[in-house]
Structures are given as structure tokens and as C-alpha cells.
Amino acid sequence: MQPTQYVGIQDIKSLGTLLDKVAEHKGCGTSSEGGKASCGSSDGPADMAPEVWEKVKNHPCYSEEAHHHYARMHVAVAPACNIQCNYCNRKYDCANESRPGVVSEKLTPEQAAKKVFAVASTIPQMTVLGIAGPGDPLANPAKTFKTFELISQTAPDIKLCLSTNGLALPDHIDTIAAFNVDHVTITTNMVDPEIGQHIYPWIYYQNKRWTGIDAARILHERQMLGLEMLTARGILCKVNSVMIPGINDQHLVEVNRAVKSRGAFLHNIMPLISAPEHGTVFGLNGQRGPSAQELKALQDACEGEMNMMRHCRQCRADAVGLLGEDRSAEFTTEKIEAMEVAYDGATRKAYQELVEQERQAKSAAKAAEQQELAQMADQSGLSLLVAVATKGQGRVNEHFGHVSEFQIYEVSSAGSKFVGHRRVDQYCQGGYGEEDALETVIRAINDCHAVLVAKIGGCPKDDLQKVGIEPVDRYAHEFIEQSVIAYFMDYLERVRSGQIEHRPRGDADIRQGAYTSVQSTSAAA
């Protein structure tokens, strides 16, 4: 496979250079269809209405492809909550846990707006501002909508989102629509109050605390009503569901059907996070989360009904950056107060045009590799999972030792698709390999036949091979899906020639708890 020639975003050093390159390309990439010009992926999928594509094409949560290129941020202006979930424990000054409901500091709407402008100026591919806590945005409506007002006045190009439990949602539909909030996420874990009572100890509704089945029934009815009202307004709705083995894991298939029938655009089934150190009811009671195999099986079962989101990172309520990274420490209130923030919409637009060129090149590369696969692959049903070390842009561009998460792709004769991610402790710490960390890495990708990396040291390479995971660095800096397909074709050839024997892999762990990582540029390990 020949190296792809492209203009890398990381090569842009100044605004002058950026604008020169945009002018050179006239803001558009060129597709592989007879050289016909098109602005990145602006045409959208054939099965998606143009107005929907405009809403999702650069939204990293609503588009799996977009999450490789575009960033999001959350602002923590909503500390209060109107329900209690057994999987949640809100923390307001926590820096070392990566999960919903956790922030390092609470913000006023004015502080939040300045933070958004600072981030947007520093990370021009940040396209989405979401309010997701640490409580519920609609249990804090004044702060939530004041924040939206301040941001929309100065930065109308930034998409506004909120994530809610849905209890107060029907009361705020008009205001949500008035602020042009095009994306709302509702966390829906049940459509049967008998099951819901084991997830929600209480809700606070109409100045009264409700418990048991009554609480679950009210919450369910309000969630379904809110979803129906949003879809009637043309607002895209994503439904988040937490998979809790033994409680709602089988029931989530029914949830999937119920939300689809009410117009939900996307369903995101997430694994329960129940590490005891988080202090949740489920965590302290020993409720386990699902294995990687269990989670994928449920997602696969629901995929035939509607679009499934598999790239969720269950991020903090103050997350900043690409999905899978968190740059919030760069934008603390103290640091932002010292900044001179000037919002430059023209610069952001020019930068994002370059992102679209990169996406167009990626799509063309995948299509070319897919065509070759169709010509040579058999129909035996053989499929593999492949782990990928990446730091963004849809490329195999991360050193094995510096990875804090692997992206997981499933590949077969039908092509490749993203099916999830696995958090890991960084193997390279202070320039040296940590054997304990390597063990967690192996457990996290144990169901994968290979791991694609930009670079890997001899010791971890040997250890991976011993457990049957093939480390592959020959696709360094190439597009991920193109590389995954190329690896699969090579794998098929080796199986056919008798060089290797295909053997199924086992299950893998889903990482929980805080990250254990250090910032290191060492190439050791």
C-alpha cells in the first residue's frame, strides 16, 4: 500500500499558512468519482436526508466518522439533579476519574462562555458545546439556558447540545427549540417500571420525592413524552442506555424498539461503570459491568432496529477535546482568567475546511481498499477484531506505549467498521515499560487478532506475540479503515497459503476506574 499524500492539520503553523492552503484548494477536496469536486463529505450518506446530515456531519457524538476529526466540550454549569441513579455519584472537585457526573470545578454561565470561546480559539475543530452536568441541565434551567444565550450571541457556528434524564424535559421543549438546540440526549435505561425501580431509588417531581415503582413510572412517562415532543420539532435525539448485567441487559432490546418507534435518531448502549472507588450504589454493592463480548452482542442485537453509537467515551461533565482525549486541564478558570480571548470565526471555518479535505481523502482510500477486498475475499464468514493505536484524524498514528485507549474495528469480507474502544493504562511511563500496565493492555484487547500501531518496542512486541496478538507497524500514519482492510486481506492470504491457522480469540475486559498515565514523549518501550 503506497503512502497517502495529504496536507496534515498538524503541519499548519500559522493562520497565514492555513489560509494559503485553503485558497490553494479552493476550500474543497476532490473525490475519486472522476475527479468531481466536493467539499469534504458534504454530500452525506445516500440514506440520510440532507438537513439531517448538516446537523450531524461535524458532530463527534452523532457521527462515528466525525469523531475522528472534530472535538467537543462540556461546561459544568448544572450541579443539581432531580433523580438519583444507582450507577451515579456526582463529584465536583475530582481530577482523576473519567466518567459522567464528575468535574474539577463548577462554572457560572459567564465563566462557561469565556471558557468556550477560549477553547474554540485554541481548538478550531471544536464544533459542539454540550451541557451534561454534573447534575441534570434541566434541573438547572436558568444556568443552562443563560449559558446557551451567551454562547449563541458570539459563536453561532457552535452546535448546542444538552444531555438529560428526561424528567423535566417536556417543560422546556419550547425554550430548547428557541435556542436552536439541534441535539438532545436522553438517558433511558428502562421502559418497564418494574425494572426501573432497581435503577432509580428516587426522583423529585412536582415538589415531591417519589420512590419505587411510582418513581420509575413517572420517569418513564416523562422520558417518552419528551422524546416524542422533540422529534415532532425536528430536534435530533440520541438515547443513552447503561447496560447493567442481570437488571436491564436483556430489557434494553425492548428499550431500543420503544425509542425507535418514537423517532430517536441514535441509540448508545454503554457499559455500567461500577468501580468501588467511585462510591456508587452499584459499585459498593458489587454489581459487575458487562464484558466486552456481552456489550458487543447486545449492540449487535439492537443494530438491526436503528443506528447504534459505539464510539461513546462516557466522558466527564467538563471534558474538552476529541473523544478519547481530555484537555480540560489546559482550560481551568484560573488559566482562562489570564487569557485574552478573541473569537475568530473565519479562522475556525478555514481550519474546518481542511478537516473536510482530510475526511474526503480518508473516504476515497477506504473505498479503494474495499473494492480490492471485494475482488479477493471469500465468503467464508471469517471476521476479526483489530485494535488500533490512534491520536486522531482517522490514522494509525500513535506509539503503542503512549496509548490510553485503543479503537476496535471489526473486519470481514463485507468491509470494516468501528465497534468500540478500550481504555488502558499507558505502557510507557517515564520512558520505561511497565509490565503491570502491559498486562492490563493485553486483557483489554484479548479478543483482537492484531494491533495496528505507529511504533512499538521489542519487549511489548514479543509479549503480544506470545499471547497470539499480532503487533503491526507497517501501516504507520495511514488511514485506519484502509489499513484494517489491507491487514485483513494479508491475513486471508496467509490463512489460505497455510502460513497461519485462523483461531478464534477470547473475551476482553472493559476498563473501569481512573486513568493511570503520564504525559511522555519518550519513544522507549
UniProtKB/Swiss-Prot annotation:
UniProt cofactor(s)? [4Fe-4S] cluster
Q: Name the enzyme group at the top EC level.
A: lyase
Q: Which GO terms describe its molecular function?
A: 4 iron, 4 sulfur cluster binding; lyase activity; metal ion binding
Kindly summarize what the UniProt induction comment says about this protein's expression.
Expression occurs only in the absence of ammonium and under low levels of oxygen, and is strictly dependent on NifA.
Gene3D superfamilies recorded for this chain? Aldolase class I, Dinitrogenase iron-molybdenum cofactor biosynthesis domain
Q: Any idea where the Radical SAM core domain is? A: 67-316
Cofactor: record remark: Binds 3 [4Fe-4S] clusters per monomer. One cluster is coordinated with 3 cysteines and an exchangeable S-adenosyl-L-methionine. The two others probably act as substrate.
Where does this protein have compositionally biased stretches of type Polar residues?
514-525
- Residues given in the record as [4Fe-4S] cluster 1 binding sites: C81, C85, C88
Which family, according to the similarity comment?
Belongs to the radical SAM superfamily. NifB family.
Reported function: Involved in the biosynthesis of the iron-molybdenum cofactor (FeMo-co or M-cluster) found in the dinitrogenase enzyme of the nitrogenase complex in nitrogen-fixing microorganisms. NifB catalyzes the crucial step of radical SAM-dependent carbide insertion that occurs concomitant with the insertion of a 9th sulfur and the rearrangement/coupling of two [4Fe-4S] clusters into a [8Fe-9S-C] cluster, the precursor to the M-cluster.
Quote the protein name from its UniProt record: FeMo cofactor biosynthesis protein NifB
Q: Which organism is it from?
A: Herbaspirillum seropedicae
Q: Which gene encodes it?
A: nifB
